[in-house]
Amino acid sequence: MRRLALEAGCAIMEIYNGPDFEVKTKSDSSPVTAADEAADTIISDGLHATFPDVTLITEEQADSHSLKSTEFFIVDPLDGTKEFVHRRGDFTINIAYVVNGIPIRGVVYAPAKHRLFYTDAQGQSLEETGPFDLEKIGTCQNISVAIPNPDGLRVVASKSHRDPTTDAYIAKYPVSDLKSAGSSLKFCLIATGEADLYPRAGRTMEWDTAAGHAVLNGAGGGVVRFDDLTPLTYGKPGYENPYFIAFAKGVSLQKP
């Protein structure tokens, strides 16, 4: 999974750093570029070749969205296409492995930010520092959530999808810092101790969250449903998520 994320990142950055690229619109009105498609081909081909018997769900292949399994890979080859299109850098490659509703392995790679996060075989999350080599793993550091300051939480929210419900929920907490970030980087900022709370009261799909969720789990954090604060699970109908809250353990979660 690490190697495929890096290979996909190389393909994405070649387009990102090149001349203007075409932006098409999918049936759900979301944007898609040649970078999404190139990364999807690299990751899909690699996973099918290595794990031919494991179901693969990927954002860019609509036919996969009706597949069902208790064990599957779920992929967003370019999470944060709007950030990519506007060359803001906050986009990621997300690859996760889900078993019985739980994302147990995940890779999140932000090629423009030179940040790479993933879980190891024991479930511990780490960040690898670049430069990144396809064959050789570089310097890695275990990551873990911070102990939140109850007098002022550090909150991270969507850069492209803010809404009144999210803002109202954030207002329930004492906040010392509020930052915006794109894509699944928000989960990783909590996982590294750079933020404490990420509420999302907007539409997301499982491929948007599974890899970041796995990384956050492996760093001691968690993700729950917004409505009843029960754990967010995967393999739901249509692979659609409810609203959710990602958090560092130690945050006293408020009900909406």
Could you tell me what each predicted segment is?
Residues 67-69, 85-89, 119, 237:
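Short glycine/proline-enriched turns and hinge-like loops at secondary-structure junctions
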Residues 71-111:
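Glycine-rich active-site/cofactor-binding loop and its immediate structural neighborhood
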Residues 26, 59, 158, 181, ...:
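Conserved beta-strand termini and adjacent loop/short-helix elements that scaffold enzyme active sites
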